[in-house]
Amino acid sequence: MKERTFVALKPDAVKRKLIGKIIERFENKGFEIVAMKMIKLDREMAEKYYEEHKGKEFYERLINFMTSGRMIVMVVEGENAISVVRKMIGKTNPAEAEPGTIRGDFALTTPDNIIHASDSKESAEREIKLFFKEDEIFDK
Ligand SMILES: Nc1ncnc2c1ncn2[C@@H]1O[C@H](COP(=O)(O)OP(=O)(O)OP(=O)(O)O)[C@@H](O)[C@H]1O
């Protein structure tokens, strides 16, 4: 089933100049990038985005990291995009992510684990809406 997922290249990916290498993997796999832009999260947006982690031991570090620099956000489209992209990015903790996955190949620690991708249809819809207006997403 053709579907859309939301992907963010986190501040460490931009700082380390990995944007091209990561996008290349999605294009090589056969996905279409139907929306993309550069953003910088402010504290309010980061807190809204990571609401579920409020109160956790790593929350402050996570918010500081996510607001530390610019990011790339995109909408990736293709067959089973949500589950396939999650597989391609690898486990949340890069030390446990398999080699061959994006986190397995490019990261070693959290919260600076390079990339985020939606983990369900509901979160994909929510996250795409949070970052893109309808007319910023292109079908053709
Ligand atoms: N134990 C931890 N210590 C530090 N940072 C963490 C830890 N666990 C998660 N994080 C950070 O919070 C983010 C969100 O965690 P979550 O458990 O939702 O994982 P995820 O769904 O793989 O991540 P993301 O939402 O970024 O794709 C992680 O990607 C990572 O940057």
Curated annotation (Swiss-Prot):
Provide the family line. Belongs to the NDK family.
Essential cofactor(s): Mg(2+)
Domain of life where this protein originates: Archaea
In Gene Ontology terms, what is one molecular function of this protein?
metal ion binding
Gene name, per UniProt, is ndk
UniProt main location, coarse: cytoplasm
Q: What is this protein called?
A: Nucleoside diphosphate kinase
PROSITE patterns assigned to the protein according to its UniProt record, in alphabetical order: NDPK (PS00469), NDPK_LIKE (PS51374)
A GO cellular component annotation here is: cytoplasm
Q: Which Pfam families match?
A: NDK
What EC number(s) are associated with this protein in UniProt? Answer: 2.7.4.6
In which compartments does the protein localize?
Cytoplasm
What keywords are assigned to this protein?
Answer: ATP-binding, Cytoplasm, Kinase, Magnesium, Metal-binding, Nucleotide metabolism, Nucleotide-binding, Phosphoprotein, Transferase
Species this chain originates from: Methanocaldococcus jannaschii (strain ATCC 43067 / DSM 2661 / JAL-1 / JCM 10045 / NBRC 100440) (Methanococcus jannaschii)
The biological processes this protein is annotated with in GO are: CTP biosynthetic process; GTP biosynthetic process; UTP biosynthetic process
Q: Where does ATP bind?
A: 10, 58, 86, 92, 103, 113
Which SUPFAM superfamilies does the entry mention?
A: Nucleoside diphosphate kinase, NDK
